[in-house]
Amino acid sequence: MAPVSREAADAADAATPPMLKHWREVKAQHPATILFYRVGDFYEMFHEDAELAARVLEITLTSRGDGVPLAGVPVKAAAEYLRQLIAAGHRVAICEQVEDPKLARGLVRREVVETVTPGAMLQEGWLAGGKNNFLVALSGAEPEVGLAAIDLSTGEFLLETLDAAGVAEALGRLGLAAIVVPGDAALPTPDGVLRTTRERWEFDPDLAREEVARRFAIATLDGLGVGPGDAPALGAAGALLRYLTELQPAGMPHLARPVVRRSDAFLWVDEMTRRNLELVEPLRAGARGCTLLETIDATVTPMGGRLLRQWLLSPLRDPAAIAYRLDAVEVAVRDGRGRERLREALDGVRDVERLAGRAAAGRATPRELGALRDSFLRLPDVSEALSALAASTLPVPTSPHPQQSESRPSPPARGEHAAALADAADELDLLADLASDLARGLEERPPALLADGGVIRPGYDSELDELRALRDGGRQYIASLQQRERQRTGIPSLKVGFNKVFGYYLEITRAHAARVPPDYERRQTLATAERYVTPELKDYEARVLGAEERMGTREAELFGALRSAVGRAIARVQRTARVLARLDVWAALADRAVAGRYVRPRVHDGFDLVLRQSRHPVIERMMARELFIPNDAQFTDAERVALVTGPNMAGKSTILRQIGLCVVLAQMGSFVPAAEASVGVVDRLFTRVGASDNLAHGQSTFMVEMSETSAILHNAGPRSLVLLDEIGRGTSTYDGVAIAWAVTEHLHDR
């Protein structure tokens, strides 16, 4: 191909329309991103973006007059198309018109106002209410890796420094939506998760320290709990903030201060164990009611649903912290009426956390602000129900715990109030000022869109009331004018009408054309009628249409002020949302405990694990009309290995799983399905259940089994709970028995 001359290139550039030139400039700044370019009432896409969008969205691919490929979607319907592109794993940059086209001189000014990715979404209704949407950044290498996670929809910001071997487990705990890593790093990325690479310098801890301090207006990070050993996590946080700032140029005012998490505070549950125990996802895709989360989730708010999922995926290891939660659950179990009052009060609370985040970001619609108002107005009922529960005391035991010995710590104190409920009562902000402002300002049922009008309540603003009176009075004026003109002209069919093109007009049929007064000015000719205007009608039109335009502007100003008030109070709203989430989880766990006849476990730092008449919570609930046979399990410091034998379909795998599920429930702060439970804190939980191959990676059933078993043997410690089902069945009987024997011996002796 012959080289293109400079003159030819200049000529081609000169022939390119100014709008397309600007599109190219913006596109160059956002490579590997589909650009939604606002043109009037459409978002248009050009060149390769148009071709890709046409395939994914199944929309028409056309071209401009100059042959440039073109596809577009209406602005009003753009949200659904945008959601489809994000679900397909694409990034989309939204380039909006940032000035009124009527006032523009030349090309309308446009800017990218947001880049939407699977890990950075603020759009209404896109995310599952009961699940976080974390964008995660990883930094560092052996032996320590830093992790930073931000859920843009809720404002949560987490930091964690962990061993390189624990990265996959930590990512599984979060349930991330996308990941950011240095371009030269060999860090793990879960399958199906969008991966973004950044320059190594962006992960520098010193730069990150400055970035975090500047963003949250603090002089030092000491108050955040960031220590010298958290440099890797800090580096990840800096890169993550820088990346999100590019995606959200308008800012992230709802972003909370980072919370430092310590990996040794949580029970290690790897991906294999989460899958085998079906904690949050079923083994069979699409199966319903098969997970532990579905079994225990009786929450009534989206915030509570998300927190319950977090607790289930991150059980605790500190007996005192576990008892703190269990005390609250026990009070709610014992006070059934108080529990139901609390749940009824919470039932009308919407997703305050995400709605407030959208308000702070200037994205909340009138209907969403109305949902916040309705939620805030329920807070006094929540507070009253909480105060009654917090006043309840835990019962004083009449005898020592059956499994208690002098070498074991005592169970939590009784005859006292639950500290968790008292703390929640102290922290709950009724947000009375916001509730009052929103109740006075918003209509009872605000519309979905501000442009629809009818957002602000009458009597809230005198200027708006005057403009509305002028508009509403116009209806009477039109009726009066029509009657007067009929009498003056003697034309009984004369009528006053309006359309967006010609404005107000007087319409007269051709049969009465001879009676048209001389002061009527013809405006439009129809097949059977003529349309006219008069000086009086022109003057009225100018006044009314001007009033409607000013009314829309004023209503937008007032709504913006109400939304900004929520944004300014975002920290208070987020604190209250966190309290509501905890209350919802405690009440839900209590409700499930009562319905399932669960008992409070005694959680301690010994090595005993005793379960009397334990049941599998999921299976028991699924076979509600059948009798589930309970089973005992007992492990002590002296007897730490148990072999379960029996015929096929006798329930051996069920017993293994129910032991694991009872431990998870106990350490997350829930009652457990048993007659009695004593749980010595477990630091790591491993399971090897079932047989499967991994042909995509060239691994047979036996290879997968041995790889998983090897990982367990390398990572299990003195406080680990290991549940192995039929080790060695992927090979011959003789070899399988030898493998099972060797593995059992190793676990027993270590």
What spans do the regions from the language model cover?
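Charged catalytic and DNA/RNA-contacting regions of genome-maintenance
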Residues: 2-334, 340, 344-360, 364-394, ...
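Amphipathic alpha-helical coiled-coil segments and their boundaries
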Residues: 315, 335-338, 365, 453-456, ...
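Active-site phosphate-binding and catalytic loops of NTP-dependent enzymes
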Residues: 95, 118-127, 251, 479-491, ...
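Charged, surface-exposed helical/loop "interaction arms" that form contiguous linear patches used
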Residues: 361, 365, 378, 420-423, ...
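Intrinsic disorder/low-complexity segments
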Residues: 391-417
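Extended, charged coiled-coil "arm/hinge" scaffolds of SMC/Rad50-like chromosome-maintenance ATPases
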Residues: 443-447, 526, 530-564, 580
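ATPase nucleotide-binding head domains, primarily ABC-like/P-loop NTPase cores
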Residues: 47-50, 300, 311, 509-541, ...
